[in-house]
Amino acid sequence: MLANDRTDNTLYFEGFKKIALERGAHYKIVDMNALDELRESMSFETENVIIPMSPSEKVFSKLVKTLDNMERTDSVKITMFGQSNWQQFMGKYKGAFQKYNCTFFSKFLYDPLDEEIASFQLNFKRRFGREQYQSYPMYGVMGYDLGMYFLNAYNQFGKDYADYLSEFESRFMQTPLYFERKNKDGGLVNNRVMFVKFGTNGTVEKKIY
């Protein structure tokens, strides 16, 4: 189900419709201002994948409230699929993320509860006397990931390291990196994307492509 709130997200909206048509998947567009349609559209036989067209917290909260108020939701299999900025409020709605098997895609994942990131935050504050500027992604962590990536590549391949980046991967805290050159005259592009999935049993699964 595509939950449309009439925001200007045409490419995202049309992209999912195209994929559904190509794969022969059944879908229904539900107006966010008429969420009774959501209840009526639920299947008790197959998994219901709900894709809000807007990535906003307001839309997410509205959907969760509607799902929570539905009868017999325990017997309905639901997955919600969103965009990268869901991580900005995933801590606030952790219970809902787990209950509804929330999955989102992103080029990065900032998890302040991750031990390595928590240690980086402490070291940053000790060195610079202040907290990192709050943003998504966190630019201090991104700078560390990029610095370690290119320094390790240089250490392994020497001055011609840029010719070998398609063969090289490095550990990361926030941003997975894998650079490829689109053509001989072009620059390098990071082609990594991450899918983050919350399970009803409290697990968080990260898959990188």
Regions found by a protein language model. Name each.
Residues 1-209:
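Extracytosolic ligand-binding ectodomains
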